[in-house]
Amino acid sequence: MSPVDRLREALPDAARDVRLNLQAVLQGGALTEGQRWGVAVASAAAARQPALLSAVLAEARSRGLDSAAEDGLAAAALMAMNNVYYRFRHMVGKPGYTEMPARLRMGRLAQPATSRADLELFSLAASAINGCEACVRTHEDVVVKGGIGEEAVHDAVRIAAVIHAAAVALEAGEVAGGHEAVSAA
C-alpha cells in the first residue's frame, strides 16, 4: 500500500468524501504525472499537516518525481512569503504600497527544477490554499500563457482543494481522538 493510500485509510469516517476525492484527483486528468504530484506536494506543504506532507512527498519521490517534489516545496515556501505580502498590499489598497518594490528574493522562479510553467502551477495551488486573490490571478495568467490549459489549471486547483480538505480532516480526527497520527512509512 502506498503512503498516500495509507493516509487515505486513516482519514476519519466523517471525511469519507475526502477519502474518495483524494484517490480520484491524484489519477489521470489534464495534468502530467509530474504536474499532478508537484501540485500535491505544494498543496500539502501549504496545508501544513506533517503526516500529509510526508505521505505525499514519499509518494512523489517513489515515482521518481524528485524535481517536481522539490519545486512543489519551493513553491509552497515562496508562496508562504509572497501570499502574505501581496495579500496585504491588495487588502490595504493604497497606491503607495503597490508602488514600493517588494525586495523579496524569488530566484527559484528563474531556475526551477522542472519548468517555469510547472513551478507557477505549483505556486497557483499554494496561493489558492493561502487565499491570495492577487497571487492566484497572476499565477493563473502566467500558467495559461505558458501553455498549460484551463482544464489543467482546474485539475490543479481541485487537487489543492482536496489536499487541504484532507489536512483539515486529519487534524480534526486527531483532535477528536478518533485516529492516531499517520506516518508515511
From Swiss-Prot:
Biological process according to GO: cell redox homeostasis; response to oxidative stress
Keyword check for Amino-acid biosynthesis: no
SUPFAM superfamilies according to UniProt: AhpD-like
Keyword annotations: Antioxidant, Disulfide bond, Oxidoreductase, Peroxidase, Redox-active center
Pfam families: CMD
InterPro entries (UniProt xref): AhpD, AhpD-like, AhpD_core, CMD-like
EC number, UniProt record: 1.11.1.28
Chemical reaction(s) catalysed: N(6)-[(R)-dihydrolipoyl]-L-lysyl-[lipoyl-carrier protein] + a hydroperoxide = N(6)-[(R)-lipoyl]-L-lysyl-[lipoyl-carrier protein] + an alcohol + H2O
Keyword Disulfide bond part of the UniProt annotation: yes
Cystine connections: C132-C135
Active site (record annotation): C132 (proton donor), C135 (cysteine sulfenic acid (-soh) intermediate)
GO molecular function annotation: alkyl hydroperoxide reductase activity; disulfide oxidoreductase activity; hydroperoxide reductase activity; peroxiredoxin activity
Family statement drawn from the similarity comment of this UniProt entry: Belongs to the AhpD family.
Function as written in the Swiss-Prot or TrEMBL entry: Antioxidant protein with alkyl hydroperoxidase activity. Required for the reduction of the AhpC active site cysteine residues and for the regeneration of the AhpC enzyme activity.
Protein name, UniProt field: Alkyl hydroperoxide reductase AhpD
Annotated organism of origin: Anaeromyxobacter sp. (strain Fw109-5)
